[in-house]
Amino acid sequence: VIPENIPNLDICWSQRMMRQEQGKMFEERNSAIYYKYSNGSVENLSESSADDEETTGDIKWVSFKNQFFSSVLVADKCLKGAKMESKPIDKNSAFYSDYHKDMEVNTSIDYKSTDANPANFLIYLGPNKFQLLKSYNKYCDSEDLDLNRLVSLGWALFRVINTYIVIPVFDWLTGVCGNMGLAILVLTILLKVVLFPLSNKSYISQAKMRLLAPDV
């Protein structure tokens, strides 16, 4: 039972992240706590080492991100700051073979028992699929949730290329081929064809340098 006179609700959310992939080190390097400031940027704790952070800003959502899947807590009302911690499981621990990181978020939310909806949340438990995550913007009228930022697409120019060219082409190929593995193969061939003029020019330049090497 929640008392009627409390001004806010304290929330403690934690997860011991289970191993899902064969490549242990690569999975660890792609797992972290992500969070989005209200009407602001998406930030994350270190993916490669233990990290902790405390913020007083309003937060729209917080996520425990794994290599291919994420669990996300989206607040209808903003979370009032958060204390976050992520640390790898010790290699000598009995849990190391099945788990790879401990993650914890402590936060709070304004609460009024007299409101029609005193504390509403949306919880996403699913794959890091760009278009699927982006589709959740429809559940928030006030701002772009930016859940698609959970998908790592590289820096600046590479992110633009991946967002507007590579992902749409891949989704189209998946629909046509009906098989993701075949779609990846076809996309790889297409990229090699597109990049062939640049790579061929590089090979020719290297060959010329090898011919000149004895003279130099």
Regions found by a protein language model. Name each.
Residues 1-146:
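Soluble non-transmembrane domains of integral membrane proteins
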Residues 55-59, 179, 195:
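Residue-level detector of functional hotspots within protein domains
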Residues 71-73, 123-125, 166, 191, ...:
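Long, contiguous hydrophobic alpha-helical segments, chiefly transmembrane helices and signal peptides
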Residues 114, 191-216:
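Membrane-interface amphipathic helices and adjacent TM-edge segments
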Residues 126-179:
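Interfacial loop/helix-cap signal at membrane boundaries in integral membrane proteins
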